[in-house]
A protein has these predicted regions:
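Membrane-embedded, hydrophobic transmembrane alpha-helices
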Residues: 1-54
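Transmembrane signal-anchor helices characteristic of membrane glycosylation enzymes that use polyprenol
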Residues: 58-83
Length: 213
């Protein structure tokens, strides 16, 4: 279970590192970054000697299935949020269309109004950068929202493992229920299918609790 959650977090984080490195050397975000990130993360997981072979491959297959299903669902679900449609999606679109924020402060590939430019150029864009690698690969602007589901799924698993470690005598179903309640708070549920990012720090912080246990 832990390797499943670890992979779901590793893939977007590796995508982010590759995207930033590409931008830093003067390249653009392209359709190869996300598949390469998946391959690197899977190879890294395969190299873990602590995991038995059958468990390792079962985990990898499960993660690939989750990636496929969530990408398909996200591509079909339209982001109806205000900020999600506005500067979040605009930032992703600019990155996909060739904007390099490291070497160019102006969003030049496509014309956008001055007020939106202020948000696109100066708002932190970590999640948007990861989403842009997904969108560039999938060719669908809404597909990047799958990232939300990966982080949420991993947080559920990590909370469950945290409870297993700290409260080993607790009923298994009660642990599952608590993990779902903690991971799926109202903000997370409301923003899970949008490009809002208010939930991100909470979800990653919750996942971090298992590492500190």
């Amino acid at each position: 279970m832990e390797s499943f959650a670890r992979l779901l977090i590793a893939i977007p984080l590796v995508s982010y590192v590759l995207a930033v490195l590409s931008l830093w050397v003067g390249l653009q975000i392209n359709s190869f970054i996300f598949p390469i990130a998946v391959c690197i993360s899977v190879l890294w997981e395969c190299s873990d000697k602590r995991i038995r072979g059958c468990v390792r491959w079962t985990t990898i297959v499960a993660v690939l299935v989750v990636l496929s299903v969530t990408l398909g669902l996200s591509a079909c679900i339209y982001d109806r949020s205000f900020d999600g449609q506005w500067y979040h999606a605009c930032t992703i679109r600019e990155l996909v269309n060739g904007w390099n924020p490291i070497h160019s402060s102006a969003c030049s590939p496509t014309p956008i109004d001055g007020y939106t430019v202020l948000w696109v150029e100066h708002y932190p864009r970590g999640i948007e950068t990861i989403a842009a690698t997904i969108v560039s690969c999938m060719g669908n602007l809404d597909a990047g929202k799958a990232l939300n589901l990966w982080f949420v799924f991993s947080s559920i698993v990590y909370i469950y493992l945290f409870l297993c470690h700290c409260l080993p005598t607790m009923n298994k179903y009660l642990r599952i229920w608590i993990a779902l309640v903690v991971a799926l708070n109202p903000v997370v549920i409301n923003q899970m299918c949008t490009y809002y990012i208010d939930w991100t720090l909470y979800t990653l912080s919750v996942s971090y609790t298992h590492l500190r246990a």
